[in-house]
Amino acid sequence: DTQALATQTLCQSSTPTNLTITVYGGIGTNSYQWYRNTTNSTTGGTLIAGATNATFTPPTATVGTQYYYCVVTQSSVGCNVTSAVSTVIIVAAPAITTQPASSSVCENGTPAILTVAYTNGTGTPTYQWFSNTTNSTIGGTAIAGATTASYSPPATTVGTLYYYCEITFSSGGCTSVL
């Protein structure tokens, strides 16, 4: 049989890689039942209602580590085989805790410094500030050299500009937050 993915680390509420079992040999029709466990073991797990296919999509809404395994039973002879354990680690999604504040400034005046802060990021963060002519975090233009948690926008152009910062993390399954 082909075992499910050994370990995956994911960001909370992200899309996981499906766990899939392929069984070779035997007689009759295979039936599948997936189990969840709080320990790295194929005994004592909790049956997952409705998880009766060769493929199972582990949930990612709750932070923590869960262990999954599948018991495959052949109907005609009553034999069964249990897969190896698949570990699914869900890490807390990063979130912006300090957003840049809006402000109005006269041309050639001194604008307020824009600052961002975050929680739950894993790894070394990198920052990239963007400007946009619309109030959106899509389609902005990366500002050259604006790669720290704070940015001092220029006040040399009349009109409205919107700024936002993308924080990217080097590891932990959670890559970025706006």
Tell where the protein language model's regions lie, with residue ranges:
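Solvent-exposed loop segments of extracellular immunoglobulin-like
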Residues: 24-36, 118-131
